[in-house]
Regions:
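Primarily recognizes the serine-hydrolase "nucleophile elbow" in alpha/beta-hydrolase
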Residues: 1-65
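Mobile cap/lid helix-loop segments that gate and shape the active-site cleft of serine hydrolases
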Residues: 61-94
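C-terminal catalytic histidine-bearing segment of alpha/beta-hydrolase fold enzymes
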Residues: 112-165
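Hydrophobic anchor at the start of a short beta-strand
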Residues: 12, 102, 131-133
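Alpha/beta-hydrolase
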Residues: 56-67, 103, 120, 127-130
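Short beta-strand/loop motif that positions the catalytic acidic residue
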Residues: 104-106, 110
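Short, proline-enriched alpha-helix->beta-strand connector loops that line the catalytic pocket
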Residues: 44-48, 97-102, 128
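Histidine-centered divalent metal-coordination motifs
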Residues: 17, 106, 142
Length: 165
């Protein structure tokens, strides 16, 4: 599809929730992974727009926060001290700046993935010259972001549409 001349990459967005939000941000920065990394690919996809819904942006921070009952250690095959190269290549925050447009939507009372994950990403992205947007939703937790019946849903839709204008 991306080879089709009618395909407008500027009007597409990668969107994910939680671990999927991590992957959306990671894919947007994957072109910055060093050639020596096992995560490097010469067949990368260009991502112009990424939406993270309560995503994990920093695997080192997620490890320190003990998110997911040890899932980060299992995903990365060890701790940040044991495999710093894996954490660097797998953490979206370490791949900044990306040049992509990012919108991070996060509930202020999310107790699954703390909003500090999105705040840290936005702060670092801004320092490095990217211009991300953080949509912080008061009284919203983790799963409301993917519930079309929740009060958070209009903000999620708005985040996506803001990247497609």
């Amino acid at each position: 599809m991306s080879q089709d001349p009618r395909f407008d990459r500027t009007r597409t967005a990668i969107i994910g929730h939680s671990a999927g939000g991590h992957l959306a941000l990671w894919l947007a920065g994957s072109h910055r992974i060093s050639k020596g990394s096992p995560l490097h690919s010469d067949k990368r996809q260009v991502v112009n727009n990424a939406v993270s819904l309560a995503g994990v942006s920093d695997l080192g921070l997620a490890w320190r926060q003990k998110l997911g009952h040890g899932i980060v250690t299992r995903l990365m095959g060890g701790t940040p001290e044991e495999h710093p190269d894996r954490y660097d290549a797998g953490s979206p925050i370490e791949l900044l700046p990306t040049g992509a447009r990012h919108v991070l939507v996060h509930g202020a009372v999310d107790d699954t993935v703390p909003i500090s994950q999105s705040e840290a990403f936005v702060e670092r992205a801004e320092k490095l010259g990217d211009r991300p947007t953080l949509v912080k939703l008061d009284r919203i937790g983790h799963y409301e972001l993917i519930d079309p019946e929740s009060e958070a849903w209009p903000s999620v839709v708005g985040a996506v549409l803001s990247l497609l204008d």
